[in-house]
Swiss-Prot record:
Disulfide bonds: none
Lineage: Bacteria, Bacillati, Bacillota, Clostridia, Eubacteriales
Gene name, Swiss-Prot/TrEMBL: tmcAL
PANTHER family: TRNA(MET) CYTIDINE ACETATE LIGASE
Protein source organism: Clostridium acetobutylicum (strain ATCC 824 / DSM 792 / JCM 1419 / IAM 19013 / LMG 5710 / NBRC 13948 / NRRL B-527 / VKM B-1787 / 2291 / W)
Protein name: tRNA(Met) cytidine acetate ligase
GO BP term, pick one: tRNA modification
Gene3D superfamilies hit by this protein: HUPs
Pfam families: HIGH_NTase1
Length: 402
């Protein structure tokens, strides 16, 4: 059985995702498509616009055969930990043959070579990286500049025809991180990539293949929902229509964050991504702000990107400060939490029961993992801003079978 893994958020699922699924099946000759999907909070550091169960159903209705939840300790982390959590999960299942991801690059050669450099970390590259970090640049910017300088230097033995701009594009960065994780884990899973079609990741203009950002922006701007009819699969359109009064946005968590900070300021510095006094800057900014946008504007600087600050705030909302999340996200994913499957997915699960080195979780009350406890708390937190979600849904909701 040729099982292909994909890693996605489907926030929400759109035509570009359908293109990815179709091309993946064609390129990988897949018998089964397994999706590791972020839960109720996504890598941008925001609540998902629609809950994880509904998004899993849309995925299973649109070409995915099995959906497994990526624990939020990974989904609410940098690209490196996000990728490591998802790839380690796929690797531990024991029967996944390949993964396929979308990228702006569209070819594996350069992505894989750059991944190898970043895993090996040659001395010359590390020295340049340190210089940029010392100048106050964010890690992503420092790494991009350091890699470009390293590739241009006579010290580099790699192909000088490499695309040096790979690390300037969001999906390329994730692709590099997926490959880095495969290399570190000494995995036998083979990576494939397809060229991303349509809007760039952060583009806000609606097109035939629109980015998830553009779709969310249109919904938040209260545009007529009919404008999305041809931007998303029918199941997603129906899902959005049915949930139009319970869609979630990052602004909704602001008051909860502000109250928590005002009553327990010291807990901010217990978050895994907090350093260099950013917790004090966040606290002082909160005193002056009345919404998330103004808070982000006041807090962002050269070292701390918008996404990193957004993740810190959402981690705080969920309660990352109560767990040793730094240790959790540096460890391979310890379990596979099943959200839903179809007939093909059912056969894949039978295969995983023979080969997996981690438990396949269908009932959360049977297991005691810190990462799982954090996910249960994430659902409780999400229920505060999405009234269609019960805080105990992780215990009561049945696995989706289509």
């Amino acid at each position: 059985m040729n099982i292909t893994g994909i890693i996605a958020e489907y926030n929400p699922m759109h035509n570009g995702h359908i293109h990815h699924l179709e091309k993946t099946k064609e390129i990988c000759k897949s018998d089964v498509i397994l999706c590791v999907m972020s839960g109720d909070f996504v890598q941008r550091g925001e609540p998902a616009i629609i809950d994880k169960w509904s998004r899993a159903y849309a995925a299973l209705s649109s070409g995915v055969d099995l959906v497994i939840e990526l624990p939020c300790v990974y989904s609410l982390s940098s690209a490196e930990f996000f990728a490591y959590g998802a790839v380690s999960l796929l690797n531990s299942l024991g029967s996944v043959s390949n993964i396929c991801f979308g990228s702006e690059e569209g070819e594996m050669h350069d992505i894989y070579l750059i991944s190898k450099i970043l895993v090996d970390e040659p001395y010359e590259y590390k020295s340049i990286l340190k210089d940029y970090l010392n100048q106050g640049f964010s890690f992503p910017k420092s790494r991009m500049h350091a890699l470009e300088m390293y590739l241009n230097s006579s010290l580099s033995k790699v192909d000088h025809g490499l695309n040096h701009d790979i690390l300037s594009s969001s999906n390329n960065i994730l692709g590099v991180e997926y490959c880095k994780s495969l290399i570190k884990l000494k995995s036998n899973i083979k990576p494939y990539t397809i060229k991303r079609e349509g809007n760039n990741y952060n583009d806000l203009e609606l097109k035939t293949i629109s980015s998830a950002s553009a779709i969310r922006n249109a919904l938040k701007s209260k545009k007529e929902i009919s404008t999305l009819r041809y931007q998303v699969p029918k199941k997603t359109f129906d899902l959005i229509s049915d949930n139009i009064n319970s869609l979630c946005y990052k602004d909704y968590i602001f008051d909860y964050i502000k109250y928590k900070a005002l009553t327990s300021k010291e807990s901010l510095n217990k978050l895994p991504d907090v350093s260099e006094g950013i917790d004090n800057k966040i606290y002082n900014s909160l005193l002056k702000c009345s919404n998330m946008d103004s808070l982000m504007t006041l807090t962002k600087n050269k070292r701390y990107t918008y996404s990193r600050i957004s993740r810190i705030l959402t981690q705080y909302f969920i309660g990352f400060d109560c767990y040793n999340t730094e240790s959790l996200r540096n460890s391979p994913c310890p379990y596979a939490r099943i959200l839903g499957f179809n007939e093909k997915g059912k056969y894949a699960l039978k295969e995983f029961k023979k080969t997996s080195s981690i438990p396949l979780i269908t009932k959360v009350n049977n297991y005691n993992f810190d990462a799982l406890s954090l996910d249960i708390n994430a659902t409780k937190a999400y229920s505060l801003i999405n009234k269609s979600v019960n805080p105990l849904d992780d215990y009561y909701r049945k696995i989706i079978i289509v």
